[in-house]
Amino acid sequence: MAVEKFETALKKLEDVVNRLESGELSLDDSLKAFEEGVKMAAFCTKKLDEAEKKVEILLKKKDGSFAKEPFRLEDD
């Protein structure tokens, strides 16, 4: 896939959604747009997963020093 940046893929995904929601595409064009949207969504999800793995929280200990810990989402 030629897309290198999350922001670029997200913009393309938004454009696809807008075209699909317009109701002006033929069935064939709608299917092509849908396929493109699925690819962009998968790319964005992959990039977000990669970013989440890199995020760390810097926590202050009682003695005043800091410790890095992996970021974890709380279960709802």
Curated annotation (Swiss-Prot):
It comes from the Bacteria. Its main location: cytoplasm. Heterooligomer composed of large and small subunits. It catalyses: Exonucleolytic cleavage in either 5'- to 3'- or 3'- to 5'-direction to yield nucleoside 5'-phosphates. This is Exodeoxyribonuclease 7 small subunit. It holds the Pfam family Exonuc_VII_S. Belongs to the XseB family. One of its GO terms (biological process) is DNA catabolic process. Keywords: Cytoplasm, Exonuclease, Hydrolase, Nuclease. Its EC number is 3.1.11.6. GO terms for molecular function: exodeoxyribonuclease VII activity. It is found in: Cytoplasm. It is an enzyme of class 3 (hydrolase).
